[in-house]
């Protein structure tokens, strides 16, 4: 089935091999109010033509709906550290690591938030790849990995075959990487650049306290600009900054991204945010993440004219360094259903191994045992509700496609 034909089939709610479960009374999953209005024309075109992009864009609405669907179970479910937006295209590799990345929506809440999100992404991926007969088997592989990690959190998982394939895709020299990054920077006013410089000076003081081995001048800014990337994070303010790095020589400069944290207030089954919302992102990346950036830190309030024009200062933001070898998976990278099966198992292991770690870093065996029992009891319902939620999502996507 061609991509266009598949999208037409999805739009009608049917595709070869799919057993439909009708959407519930809410009928559709729409973006948050105002989100479409601030989306760029290019992004809007992508949302209208790609159901997976739409899935990524409506994560907040999706999570809220998951909380509603499983409201009767929430009281008995343990609170876990969540990825918050776990899906197939969050799988990424660097030269020495692989796994789910991008913890912008990390929070604390019931583990089934991550489970349902990842299963939903599998369902959309098999529809796009015409692999729907393998959907239940792929769900099985995810649950196998998740259960394995709950039982043996230090067991790990084998490297998926696609990792080496992704690493071999157009490797870039550092010079090419830096040039590419500068091409992504969009102009900022002098006042805004000055605010970024002051903010980075504050970040430097914080990072040096934790990493005193970094050389002086590491955070000296060479250039900065607005960054317009992402799907789920497209409405967040983002700044890309070139800094001096290990030495004054331009060849070893670093790129760091400063990103605004989006509020999760109002999502019913997530824990209330702290006074420092950036901490949920930092803790999620450190506890669940396998890819370890050189720089990962919270930032101070930035008073940037362009952001103030939108009605608020850039109060809650964080920075992360970019790795030249970083490569994210796209659905088009999947060579076979076996690739997807290996990623599903690996993601299950990653999420299951660390989701029930408490604030002190403990992985209490009794908590993991209870989580295994609940997972077994709820697994069939989780599968069925995931498919129903995807049907609701596709109804919302079809609505967006209609001018």
Language-model region placement:
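Bacterial N-terminal signal peptides that target proteins for export
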Residues: 1-11
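Bacterial N-terminal signal peptides
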Residues: 9-21
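Intrinsic-disorder/low-complexity coil detector
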Residues: 22, 30-32, 186
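Conserved ATP-binding subdomain of kinase catalytic cores across diverse folds
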Residues: 28-43, 49-83, 88-167, 214-403
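Sequence-structural signature of the catalytic-core scaffold of metal-dependent phosphohydrolases
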Residues: 152-208
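Short N-terminal edge-element motif at the start of the domain
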Residues: 206-216
């Amino acid at each position: 089935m061609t991509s266009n034909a598949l999208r037409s089939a999805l739009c009608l709610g049917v595709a070869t091999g799919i057993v439909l479960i009708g959407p519930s009374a809410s009928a559709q999953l729409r973006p948050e109010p105002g989100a479409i209005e601030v989306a760029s024309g290019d992004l809007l075109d992508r949302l209208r033509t790609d159901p997976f992009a739409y899935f990524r864009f409506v994560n907040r609405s999706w999570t809220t709906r998951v909380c509603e669907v499983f409201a009767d179970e929430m009281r008995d479910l343990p609170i876990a550290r969540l990825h918050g937006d776990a899906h197939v295209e969050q799988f990424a590799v660097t030269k020495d690591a692989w796994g789910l990345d991008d913890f912008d929506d990390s929070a604390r809440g019931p583990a089934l938030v991550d489970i349902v999100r990842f299963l939903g992404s599998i369902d959309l991926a098999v529809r796009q790849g015409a692999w729907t007969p393998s959907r239940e088997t792929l769900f099985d592989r995810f649950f196998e990995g998740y259960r394995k990690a709950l039982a043996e959190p230090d067991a790990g998982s084998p490297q998926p075959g696609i990792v080496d394939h992704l690493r071999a895709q157009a490797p870039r020299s550092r010079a090419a990487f830096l040039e590419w990054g500068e091409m992504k920077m969009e102009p900022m006013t002098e006042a805004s650049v000055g605010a970024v410089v002051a903010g980075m000076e504050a970040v430097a003081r914080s990072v040096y306290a934790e990493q005193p081995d970094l050389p002086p001048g590491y955070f000296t800014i060479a250039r900065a600009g607005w960054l317009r990337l992402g799907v789920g994070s497209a409405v967040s303010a983002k700044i890309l900054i070139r800094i001096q790095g290990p030495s004054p020589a331009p060849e070893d400069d670093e790129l760091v991204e400063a990103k605004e944290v989006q509020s999760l207030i109002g999502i019913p089954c997530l824990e209330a945010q702290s006074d420092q919302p950036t901490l949920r992102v930092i803790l999620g990346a450190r506890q669940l993440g396998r890819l370890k950036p050189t720089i990962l830190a919270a930032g101070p309030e930035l008073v940037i004219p362009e952001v103030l024009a939108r009605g608020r200062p850039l109060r809650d933001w964080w920075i992360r360094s970019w790795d030249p070898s970083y490569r994210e998976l796209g659905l088009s990278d999947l060579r076979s259903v076996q690739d997807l099966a290996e990623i599903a198992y690996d993601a299950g292991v990653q999420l299951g191994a660390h989701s029930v770690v408490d604030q002190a870093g403990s992985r209490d065996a009794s908590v993991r045992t209870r989580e295994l029992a609940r997972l077994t009891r709820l697994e069939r319902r989780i599968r069925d509700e995931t498919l129903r939620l995807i049907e609701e999502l596709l109804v919302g996507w079809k609505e967006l496609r209609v001018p």
